[in-house]
């Protein structure tokens, strides 16, 4: 993880206490995400399809920081519904097995004795009683199922 914090952004505003000439070359931005090897590629004769594929992968990577997150610019939480919706696109393109193994360990850590899971994993305690439904906490079944389909890993 970054030493302090990270944010997704499109524009940067710089404020100074006195007039300063600042060129864009003076600023550095980093595209940060978990280091997952690329395993898939799509190239078509349609440049629009190629751009959509690239944008999908950039979106997936920008939301991969220790676990799948919901967005790179605000909450950056492991919303379970968002996580299981993106797993197929992710695994077709990246070897992210260790990311999902770790996230499943987080699931086991957060699961209450009665089986209840929170909507955000990992959580600081929020999301256990929100009743978002099975579509959110179904990650406990959908993530292992997709890991099995892509890797043949039945553990």
Label the predicted regions:
Residues 1-51:
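Extended acidic/polar, glycine-enriched regions
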Residues 2, 68-80, 124-137:
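Solvent-exposed loop and edge beta-strand segments that line ligand/cofactor-binding
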Residues 7, 22, 47-55, 78-85, ...:
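Generic recognition of stable, solvent-exposed alpha-helical segments in well-folded globular domains
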Residues 39, 83-109:
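Carboxylate/His-rich catalytic cores and anion/metal-binding grooves
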Residues 48-51, 55-70, 115-116, 125:
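Active-site-adjacent substrate/metal-binding segments within catalytic domains
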Residues 57, 61-65, 84, 105-108, ...:
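Amphipathic, well-packed alpha-helical segments that form the structural scaffold of globular domains
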Residues 97-155:
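Helix-terminus loop motifs that line ligand-binding clefts
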């Amino acid at each position: 993880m970054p030493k302090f914090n990270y944010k997704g952004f499109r524009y940067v505003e710089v404020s100074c206490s006195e007039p300063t000439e600042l060129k864009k070359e003076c600023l550095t931005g980093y595209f940060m995400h978990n280091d997952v090897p690329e395993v898939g590629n799509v190239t078509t004769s349609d440049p629009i399809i190629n751009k959509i594929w690239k944008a999908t992968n950039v979106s997936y990577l920008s939301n991969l920081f220790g676990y799948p997150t919901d967005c790179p610019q605000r909450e950056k939480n492991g919303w379970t519904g968002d996580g299981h919706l993106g797993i197929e696109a992710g695994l077709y393109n990246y070897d992210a097995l260790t990311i999902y193994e770790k996230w499943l360990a987080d699931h086991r850590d957060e699961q209450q004795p009665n089986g209840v899971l929170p909507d955000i994993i990992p959580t600081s305690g929020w999301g256990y009683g929100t009743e978002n439904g099975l579509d959110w906490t179904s990650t406990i079944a959908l993530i292992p199922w997709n890991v099995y389909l892509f890797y043949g890993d039945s553990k």
